[in-house]
């Protein structure tokens, strides 16, 4: 879960933390060049986000992807639609730690209990619960449904347009 975890999987057993960090730095360098060309948005996501934005809803991103990758994806696919966006940094721990979600809520001037967090992994949902937010599991993501359910979603939805029911 996250690019650093991917780097750990890419090195042989017994690799040092320094070697893992080197692989991670190389990955981040290549991501800007190649990663975005291999990335696409989920069908219907842009239209849904534009509708939420038009309704005046505050929108944020909190991802386990490294911060630069988050900013790149946001700029390419969703420019001007999000009020805040963050990824993993030295000061923002990976989910399921709730700190990143709480930071986003603070930056948008929102109480966590009035926020819904939409996630496609069980760690997303655990983070939402840990932050005191509504945990909405999205079934169109990368994790199998049974694994997603281990995060105890408050609600499951099946398509980006279903997000509009929360607005």
Where would I find each of the regions flagged by the language model?
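N-terminal helical cap/lid subdomain that shapes the substrate entry/recognition surface
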Residues: 1-47, 51-55, 68-71
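Asp-based, Mg2+/Mn2+-dependent phosphohydrolase catalytic module
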Residues: 18, 51-57, 66-167
